[in-house]
Amino acid sequence: MEQLLLQPIAKVDGEINLPGSKSLSNRALLLAALAQGTTTLTNLLDSDDIRHMLNALKKLGVNYQLSKDKKQCVVEGLGRAFNTAESGLLELFLGNAGTAMRPLCAALCLGQGEYILTGEARMFERPIGSLVDALQQAGAQVTYLENENYPPLKIKGTGLKGGKIKIDGSVSSQFLTAFLMAAPMAMEDTEIEIVGELVSKPYIKITLQIMHDFGIDVDNHNFERFIIKGKQTYSAPGHYLVEGDASSASYFLAAGAIAGGCIKVTGIGKKSVQGDIQFADALEAMGAKIEWGDDYIKASKGELKAIDMDMNHIPDAAMTIAVAALFATGTTKIRNVYNWRVKETDRLYAMATELRKVGATVVEGHDFIEVTAPEKLIHAEIDTYDDHRMAMCFSLVALGNTQVTINDPKCTSKTFPDYFEKLASVSC
């Protein structure tokens, strides 16, 4: 196993141009493929999850030209649903990319063809039952190949009817995102009713915005009910700029708050569509100095104190708060993050385990975590659980006058392949 030993970082200072958002990149690629016309995507994220989507689209008959640096992609839209009936059974390997598995599962039900959706072992532990149930309500033919409610899946594309659909919103917002993006191409109008509390609402806002950018508007009734007209076609916007990844910004902003100097991240700002920019508000509540621009956020050092906050709206960036808590006085309480348990790994268990290794006192609950900083951080080998965010979060331990060893550092390739080089570039 590869390891990366990070030496203590005394101070951070400088500017980071963020890679494109994973959530936006894969949504934009799929809608560009289904749209009428050609879309040029710029600032596309170059990472494993995006590669899995691109590979799948190629197999599905979508033509695109990817630039040498893989950050620009010209997609020739089909102007219709996928139709691979003449190709026989197609197997699509999607790694551990939830942002590819869930939306493709819904989109493939719209057209003609037979598909197997598969991936890495962890993907088979990530639930998809709520989405499949909703698709079956709309007439889709989706079956489980191994365990009920989990991939791998077999899909027989026969079109989606639409109609009145109930979908569980309490586990992952990606189920609703997937259904929303497919619904305009259903045969009839669709009315979606959310059952339970809808988690990660900001990610649904991203979905509604990008659908709008591709010419489709959704009638949103307070995130409890959504009405979508059927028999529509997405329209290529011509050019689509992918915002910087707000979740990826969190590590650098936290570093600025802990050991600035001043860190400026560009590619996101107060006009961003991503909910994870609210991470900066949480940092500010802890005592960091934050400055907002239209397309940048700056963070500088402050005396950090613990916070007690419901972070259901920023689940990915909330992980960074858990590590920032190592530098705060008092006990930080992060609440309402059950969906950490169904991400790339069980993040509540993983976070609690690794925080204890560096000396923190941790309480792990069903849907919350409490973190109290030690008097002194200790050098530990951090297991990353094949989870990109674990590796990036725990790099911040090096800001505490201690070495930290990151196991399997290349797992950051899921969203941020050159993360450690970028961190080194602002380390003094």
Swiss-Prot record:
GO terms for molecular function: 3-phosphoshikimate 1-carboxyvinyltransferase activity. InterPro entries: Enolpyruvate_Tfrase_dom, Enolpyruvate_Tfrase_sf, EPSP_synthase, EPSP_synthase_CS, RNA3'P_cycl/enolpyr_Trfase_a/b. 3-phosphoshikimate binds at residues 22-23, 27, 172-174, 200, 316, 339, 343. Phosphoenolpyruvate binds at residues 22, 98, 126, 174, 347, 389, 414. Its main location: cytoplasm. Keywords: Amino-acid biosynthesis, Aromatic amino acid biosynthesis, Cytoplasm, Transferase. Its EC number is 2.5.1.19. It catalyses: 3-phosphoshikimate + phosphoenolpyruvate = 5-O-(1-carboxyvinyl)-3-phosphoshikimate + phosphate. GO terms for biological process: amino acid biosynthetic process; aromatic amino acid family biosynthetic process; chorismate biosynthetic process. The active site is at residue 316. Pfam families: EPSP_synthase (PF00275). Monomer. Belongs to the EPSP synthase family. Catalyzes the transfer of the enolpyruvyl moiety of phosphoenolpyruvate (PEP) to the 5-hydroxyl of shikimate-3-phosphate (S3P) to produce enolpyruvyl shikimate-3-phosphate and inorganic phosphate. HAMAP family: EPSP_synth (MF_00210). This is 3-phosphoshikimate 1-carboxyvinyltransferase. It comes from Psychromonas ingrahamii (strain DSM 17664 / CCUG 51855 / 37). The lineage of its organism: Bacteria, Pseudomonadati, Pseudomonadota, Gammaproteobacteria, Alteromonadales.
